[in-house]
Amino acid sequence: MPLLKVAKLLWAAPCSAVGLLFAAVPLSFGGKGAWRHGALEVTYRRNQASCGKLAHALPFRGIVFGHVILAVTDEELFHIGPHERVHVEQYERWGPLFFLAYPLSSLWQILHGRSPYWDNHFEIQARHRSTDVHREGGGV
């Protein structure tokens, strides 16, 4: 493994550790995980029909902590995977500082009357870069 990749894994490792703690929940209830595209992708169920009420009530369909991508279903991961992998790259760049930078970007947006999610710098970048990946024929 190239030294730079090892450095990125180590730099994001504290965030990935948090992701592993959260991943234990779906995995303990029959979810599945696999290392793909440079991250551990964990899903709870194959599709929405097989999810319970709690999974439907979650305020997100996918979330990333370091090199751990958590998605509710395989179907959703297929659609949001490119976007979430941009967040993995952001964790590789920012490391543990991402846990501070992301909410600060959201706070900045709120203070300027904008959406803390849609106008967050990291979300804008993820939407833009994941759209480019799909246009170029990359992605999932």
PLM-predicted stretches and their roles:
Residues 1-60, 98-140:
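Metalloprotease/metallohydrolase-associated module, dominated by Zn2+-dependent proteases
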Residues 57-82, 92:
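Short pre-active-site segment immediately N-terminal to the catalytic Zn-binding motif
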Residues 76, 95, 133:
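Residue-level detector of flexible, active-site-proximal loop/helix-junction positions
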Residues 80-84, 90, 116-119:
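Hydrophobic alpha-helical transmembrane segments and immediately flanking/interface helices
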Residues 85-101:
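Catalytic Zn2+-binding segment of zinc metalloproteases
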